[in-house]
Amino acid sequence: ALEYCDYVETDVRITADNNLILFHDPDLNERFIKELTTEEILSQLDNVKKDELILSSRDQIKGKVNFEIKTDSLLQPQIDILFQKMLPILHPEDIVTSFNWKSIQDFKELFSCRYGIILDHEDALFEAKSLSIHDEDMFFMVERTLLDSRHFDLPLNRTVIWTVNEKNDFVHFLDMGAFGVITD
């Protein structure tokens, strides 16, 4: 993948025993990741070693990374632990993003990398526009249909559009001046 892209996007979740793992889905076999210990997760995954599952060092991943921090259904103490554990992992060329705008705002001064918020509905555009004016470093990960909204007015040079799978759209958005696109 690194041959064809500038960044790799991956989801970060926290386990019941407060370990960070790279895992897209919120659950595993109908149990939430946040409720499972690392050992319980390992017992359900074939051929995965503990040191491969737990994200403990930036050295585990090559290239630039967009870490999407998944906080859905977490309590605030777990959210704080998740973000605090991410801080030493982040590399200056990375981007850390989340649907949890509050946590991005709370931790942005501590990040050693770029940071951004994720938008997937039109109502969020107004608040995001306000943030774009007051925070010139913030990036915006925008669901592609929001670009068609008459309310879209975010700085394209700090906008990443998802999910774009057609080559023509990919080229079009980059030609428009978008910072990037996320594709499957």
Model segments located where?
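Conserved, mostly hydrophobic/aromatic
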Residues: 1, 11, 41, 67, ...
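Surface-exposed amphipathic alpha-helices with a cationic face
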Residues: 2, 58-59, 87-90, 104-112, ...
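Short, well-ordered coil/turn segments that N-cap beta-strands
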Residues: 4-6, 61-65, 92-94, 111-115, ...
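An active-site metal/cofactor-coordinating segment within enzyme catalytic domains
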Residues: 6, 12-64, 69-72, 117-120, ...
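C-terminal active-site rim and adjoining tail of enzyme catalytic domains
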Residues: 13, 43-51, 116-184
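Active-site-adjacent beta->alpha loops and helix N-cap segments on the catalytic face
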Residues: 15-18, 22, 75-78, 100-106, ...
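Distinct, well-ordered alpha-helical segments
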Residues: 75-88, 102-119, 125-132
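Short beta->alpha linker loops
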Residues: 98-102, 164-165
